[in-house]
């Protein structure tokens, strides 16, 4: 297809030139070259989280990142933790067989012990060595073929100083390249209003690059940032006048949501890489507000160098606000949920795997060592072979919510799998709003129809139950979300359509008025309101703003307090205010009318949206979306 002569094409040409310059300085791996699989992660900046990085005990030294790790006699470093244990199962299953070794760069005298550990078993010492040198020295400790390790094993090492003034400069799990590879990885990040978050992430990578041997990985990694509608006063992504090790290209364009911005970014990358005639091996999609260490990114690069299949790779996601809590490690869509415990795809909800696990010390590490295959991965962190992109197509036009689930299920339908890498970890914060719920439901129903749900009964029951809950509390806002999602689904002219973004932007603007009804309110005020209602023989109901239970109490309602836990804001209203009841009746009538159409035309709707997913995944769809729009290169020309 001929590329339109637009400003988008101009950006692609500039990206092509940047990729050619990058390819000229990447460092390929030749057969037999040693490479770094897994180093020490010292990126913790959260007070009180040390035990996720190193075992904390009386004789344990907490390492600094200045001039190595300086230890006194009998002080030790124990890496048997979440962030510094080595979990080899993903390599054993999805990669070439590698000969493993542990390389120490040190000065002084150390006792080094390598342990293996499995779930429900005490750690077993594999190797113990005494290392000694008055000068800085490097020693390789051979471990053996990775295929010879037990399934579900976790490896870690303990180094104890046997004299004063010992220094451990570095320690890395290493392997030798079984074949040659270019080893090129592209990381794509898209943002709308989150430029500062992306800049902080890149700055953290720059700072951490000084603390480890990341040179080859950074030379072989190219970052592309799509900053939608970038503000004119946005600070530069890369500080001027500094020796900067990251290869970064930033472009700006229209805001088409997370999915649309990503598809435009990937389309530009595909066209530019093809025009430059260069091979890209791995593609990483990362969120703009993710917190990820450079060590995690380096481990990921090494893990994918000699992959033997086209699996999607993801990683455990922890909460920024509760950094010991894992929020998800991938998930299943519409199956094995509380509402639908079966394996059939019947629910419009995810089953988050390893959800809400709390990590202290070695808790859950045996479970983490096992191979973990979720059904889908969020675009918080997802990686795939670059060639897989051409086979699967681009993310479809879902603006926000569900685009990553659909893409993962598309991969499975094409014979792929998703696997989580426990050697990595990312921190992120979930959010939810009325507009996001609209998109979650509308897109969730489309996903179910496209990937397995062949009858409308369970979906109809879902809408009936949600309507009953919101009607019982006279909640106009929540009921409107489901009414509008259903109406737009059955209309067939609003979702996954050409020029799709304006519809979503209008939805977001419309639902912001509902969000604006929420405000910060002290607990004691809610308690006073509750007590006042009780004195009058009535009840004030406090409920989440979405997914509340239907009110079934016998006491008459006095007030309703809806809470959005993501924003810590509340909305209080009188459920029997006349205008509210009139609006509630009108919205309910629209919802049930749309639901009737949905049930009667389910097969037609299912065929329609399956076709629309395929159409909006085609590069031609996104070329048309880009036509006539304004784009600009902000950095990397």
What are these regions (language model features)?
Residues 2-150, 156-161, 442-637:
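Terminal low-complexity segments of carbohydrate-biosynthetic enzymes
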Residues 170-177, 420-435:
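Active-site donor/metal-binding and catalytic loop motifs
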Residues 205-251:
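Acidic donor-binding segment of Leloir-type glycosyltransferases
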Residues 253-275:
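Glycine-rich, basic loop-to-helix element that forms the pyrophosphate-binding segment
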Residues 276-291:
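Short beta-strand-to-loop acidic/aromatic patch adjacent to the donor-nucleotide binding site
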Residues 295-347:
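Conserved donor NDP-sugar-binding/catalytic core segment of glycosyltransferases
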Residues 346-381:
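A recurrent flexible, glycine/aromatic-enriched loop bordering the glycosyltransferase active site
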Residues 377-381, 390-409, 415-421:
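Donor nucleotide-sugar recognition loop
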């Amino acid at each position: 297809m001929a590329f339109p002569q637009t400003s988008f094409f101009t950006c692609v040409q500039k990206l092509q030139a940047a990729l050619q310059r990058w390819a000229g300085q990447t460092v390929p791996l030749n057969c037999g070259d040693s490479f770094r699989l897994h180093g020490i992660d010292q990126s913790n900046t959260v007070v009180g989280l040390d035990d996720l990085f190193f075992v904390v005990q009386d004789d344990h030294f907490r390492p600094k990142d200045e001039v190595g790790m300086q230890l006194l006699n009998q002080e030790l470093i124990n890496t048997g933790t979440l962030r510094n244990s080595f979990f080899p199962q993903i390599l054993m299953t999805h990669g070439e067989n590698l000969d493993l070794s542990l390389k120490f760069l040190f000065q002084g005298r150390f006792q080094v012990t390598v342990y293996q550990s499995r779930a429900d078993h005490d750690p077993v010492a594999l190797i113990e060595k005494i290392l000694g040198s008055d000068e800085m020295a490097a020693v390789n400790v051979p471990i053996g073929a990775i295929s010879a390790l037990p399934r579900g094993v976790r490896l870690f090492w303990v180094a104890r100083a046997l004299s004063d003034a010992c220094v451990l400069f570095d320690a890395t799990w290493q392997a030798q390249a079984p074949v040659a590879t270019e080893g090129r990885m592209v990381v794509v990040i898209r943002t709308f209003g989150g430029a500062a978050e992306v800049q902080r992430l890149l700055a953290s990578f720059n700072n951490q690059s000084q603390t480890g041997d990341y040179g080859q990985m950074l030379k072989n990694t190219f970052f592309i940032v799509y900053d939608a509608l970038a503000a004119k006063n946005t600070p530069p992504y890369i500080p001027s006048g500094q020796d900067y090790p990251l290869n970064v290209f930033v472009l700006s364009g229209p805001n088409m949501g997370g999915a649309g911005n990503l598809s435009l970014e990937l389309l530009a990358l595909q066209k530019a890489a093809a025009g430059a005639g260069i091979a890209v091996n791995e593609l990483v999609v990362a969120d703009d507000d993710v917190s990820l260490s450079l060590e995690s990114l380096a481990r990921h690069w090494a893990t994918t160098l000699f992959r033997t299949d086209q699996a999607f790779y993801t990683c455990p996601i922890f909460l920024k606000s509760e950094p010991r809590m894992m929020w998800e490690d991938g998930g299943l869509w519409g199956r094995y949920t509380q509402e639908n415990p079966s394996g059939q795809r019947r629910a419009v909800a995810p089953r988050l795997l390893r959800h809400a696990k709390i990590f202290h010390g070695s808790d859950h590490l045996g479970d983490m060592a096992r191979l973990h295959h979720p059904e889908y991965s969020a675009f918080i962190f997802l990686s795939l072979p670059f060639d897989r992109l051409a086979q699967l197509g681009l993310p479809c036009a879902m603006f926000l919510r569900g685009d990553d689930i659909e893409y993962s299920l598309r991969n499975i339908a094409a014979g792929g799998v998703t696997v989580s890498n426990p050697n990595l970890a990312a921190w992120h914060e979930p959010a939810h709003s009325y507009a996001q719920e609209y998109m979650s439901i509308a897109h969730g129903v489309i996903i179910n129809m496209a990937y397995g749900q062949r009858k409308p009964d369970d979906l109809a029951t879902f809408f009936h139950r949600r309507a009953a809950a919101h009607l019982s509390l006279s909640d106009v806002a929540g009921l409107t979300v489901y009414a509008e999602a259903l109406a737009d689904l059955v209309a067939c002219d609003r979702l996954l359509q050409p020029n799709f973004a304006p519809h979503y932007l209008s939805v977001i603007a419309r639902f912001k008025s509902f969000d604006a009804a929420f405000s910060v309110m002290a607990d004691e005020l809610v308690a006073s309101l509750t007590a006042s209602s009780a004195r009058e023989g009535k009840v004030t109901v406090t409920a989440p703003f979405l997914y509340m239970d239907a009110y079934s109490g016998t006491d008459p309602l006095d007030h309703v307090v809806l809470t959005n836990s993501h924003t810590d804001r509340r909305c209080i209203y009188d459920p029997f205010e006349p205008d509210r009841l009139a609006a509630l009746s009108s919205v309910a009538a629209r919802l049930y009318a749309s639901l009737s159409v949905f049930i009667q035309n389910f097969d037609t709707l299912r065929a329609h949206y399956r076709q629309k997913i395929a159409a909006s995944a085609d590069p031609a769809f996104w070329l048309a979306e880009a036509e006539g729009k304004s784009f600009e290169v902000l950095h990397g020309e």
